[in-house]
Amino acid sequence: MRAVVLTTYGGPEQLEVSDLPGPAAPDPDGVLIRTAAAAVNPVDLQTRAGLHSAHGAFHPPMVLGWDVAGTVTAVGDRVSGFGVGDRVVSMSAQMATGRGTYAEIVALPADIVAPAPASVPLTAAAGLPLAGLTAWQALDALALPEGATLLVTGAVGSVGGLTVQLARLRGLTVVAHVRSVEDVEQARALGAARVIVGEDASTLPSGAVDGLLETAGLPRAVAAVRDGGRVVSVVPTRVPEAERGVEVSVSYVEQDGEGLAALGALVDRGELEVRSAKELGFEEAGEAHRLLEAGGVRGKLLLLP
């Protein structure tokens, strides 16, 4: 099978397409998925650069990628929830498992797979798993009551944009922080009640919100949270320091087929929008990494076999 592989840590130029042996059959509790698209995420860039090398030995050729959307081509003997031909999505924790999704065929446990939302193109659905589960689980960790005010940084990014939408569905009043005036209308369209523009935290109101969901690693954003409020960061390398009784924690995304199915149902009900930026071929994986590193991407960059 064709796959985008990494044989040594480094820049985007290290990514290349190679022919690898594909999985012959799924595990008894697993499925084989023919990839329609794999999304590009910041964690892929970090892994490629060697920033996560402490998490495990590097065994080249490494296949990157956490997100996949595609069609089931085979099911294990103990799998009852899926059949050949089903359209599905999944998030594979590549950094821990080594099961990357930049490949024509992906073998995954069935319990981390979910039906793909039927209301969007299958390729676009690849942008839902990692960003959606990150936002969903971080909001669970934040556990703000209905009616509370939540500040979301990076509010038009992949995770931030889904966080704004999901927070609104949970009855929270969302204050969105964006870096450019060009992003204000999009933040409002996603459901933000108020939008604040700025390059740093200096434009944020002091002590004005009940909670903060940090997706941008914004210095001093915790100042916007009231005394005794809550902060959850999804940027583990830039976690705000606790102060004034504010609870600060980090949310690490976990594989979750049931949660992903719930997110897909929200998409099909028209309550959650999945945004795509650009589709590129496997041969353009390096360019996709360059685009994401340059910043300013709104929606997911998708790699197609």
Model-derived regions, located:
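Residues located in well-ordered beta-strands
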Residues: 2, 16, 34, 69-71, ...
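Glycine-rich phosphate-binding loop and adjacent beta-alpha segment
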Residues: 215-273, 282, 305
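C-terminal capping/lid region of NAD(P)-dependent oxidoreductase domains
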Residues: 271-275, 289-305
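NAD(P)H dinucleotide-binding glycine-rich loop of Rossmann-like/cofactor-binding domains
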Residues: 57, 81, 91-154
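Mid-domain Rossmann-like dinucleotide-binding core that forms the NAD(H)/NADP(H) cofactor-binding site
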Residues: 126-200
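Glycine-rich beta-strand-centered segment in the early N-terminal region that forms part
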Residues: 21-40, 52-94
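A short acidic, Gly/Pro-enriched loop at the edge of an enzyme's catalytic core
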Residues: 204-210
